[in-house]
């Protein structure tokens, strides 16, 4: 029986422009059904592999315009995705030291050194409107589907950890109010800043560093064996986002942005401060009591999230320091 389910074309992005032979093979396979080319030792952090992997993961979200929904489970595409995942995961494990002490790792996330400096520090003090728009463009690839990658872990949890995690996700999805869904608030902010808020609209302009952060979430969410790493990634965001969100609110106010622009990050200043305790005590505590062998994976998730975030932060600061765009191809606008 042929599947009849469809996704509205209004919610489905166009296939991106390839960035090398690997992503070209994936795009061609999605467009006309040809078998995908095998993995050819592409740079695991590079533009080509990260875009190819992102496209394969996107089949599990909203897909692409003109691509049949059942391609999500195409055996050839799944086999290629597994090759690319292994290359990416191996690179991460090679670059990230092993750790076992989850509580020490989380305590470290709560301390921001006086000399800490990142993109949100720059935007608060010196950032210009075009840089703020670029930052939002980078973040849109995740925040327009905020909480979706993490939702895959729900059936892989049990007991108190599951109940508490669902409570946090309930908040992310607006607590029953669609107008308060975090993905919706982000789209409202994008429009207020004059940035295209269509889902997937910026896939062609964000670099591999941006794609890798989202790919980490998708990879960990889709693999039960990586559920500990997914929760480590999730904890990292929840424990570290409040100060950065506050800096972004201040940056927007300094640049004259109104409440429609600031609402998303203002919401995260308060919500993530509450979520911090829920993640530590309500999710990770019960999880590690029941499955202490997952501690190493949780630490890996924390460190992988920090590692990839650091790569993107370095790119942003380097390009902005030179007065250059951090996007691959974007006409800069605004003061």
Q: How should these model regions be labeled?
A:
Residues 1-335:
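Non-heme di-metal
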């Amino acid at each position: 029986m042929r599947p009849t389910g469809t996704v509205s074309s209004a919610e489905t992005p166009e296939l991106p422009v390839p960035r090398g032979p690997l992503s070209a093979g994936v795009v061609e396979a999605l467009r006309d059904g040809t078998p995908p080319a095998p993995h050819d030792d592409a740079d695991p952090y590079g533009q080509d592999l990260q875009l190819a992997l992102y496209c394969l993961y996107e089949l599990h979200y909203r897909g692409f315009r003109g691509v049949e929904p059942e391609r999500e489970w195409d055996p050839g595409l799944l086999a290629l995705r597994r090759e690319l995942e292994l290359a990416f995961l191996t690179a991460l494990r090679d670059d990230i030291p092993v750790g076992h002490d989850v509580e020490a790792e989380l305590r470290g996330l709560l301390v921001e050194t006086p000399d800490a400096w990142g993109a949100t520090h720059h935007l608060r003090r010196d950032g210009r409107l075009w840089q703020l728009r670029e930052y939002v463009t980078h973040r849109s690839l995740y925040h327009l589907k905020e909480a979706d990658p993490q939702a895959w872990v729900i059936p892989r949890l049990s007991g108190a950890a599951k109940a508490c995690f669902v409570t946090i996700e309930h908040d992310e999805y607006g607590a029953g109010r669609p107008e308060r869904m975090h993905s919706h608030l982000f789209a409202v902010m994008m429009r207020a800043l004059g940035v295209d808020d269509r889902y997937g609209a910026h896939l062609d302009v964000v670099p591999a560093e941006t794609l890798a952060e989202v790919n980490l979430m998708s990879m960990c969410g889709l693999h039960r064996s990586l559920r500990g790493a997914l929760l480590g990634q999730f904890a990292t965001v929840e424990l570290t986002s409040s100060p950065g969100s506050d800096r972004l609110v201040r940056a927007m106010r300094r640049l004259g942005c109104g409440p429609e622009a600031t609402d998303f990050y203002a919401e995260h200043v308060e919500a993530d401060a509450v979520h911090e305790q829920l993640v530590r005590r309500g999710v990770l505590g019960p999880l590690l009591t029941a499955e202490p062998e997952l501690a190493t994976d949780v630490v890996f998730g924390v460190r992988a999230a920090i590692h990839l975030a650091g790569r993107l932060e370095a790119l942003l600061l380097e390009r902005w320091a030179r007065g250059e765009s951090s996007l691959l191809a974007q006409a800069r606008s605004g003061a």
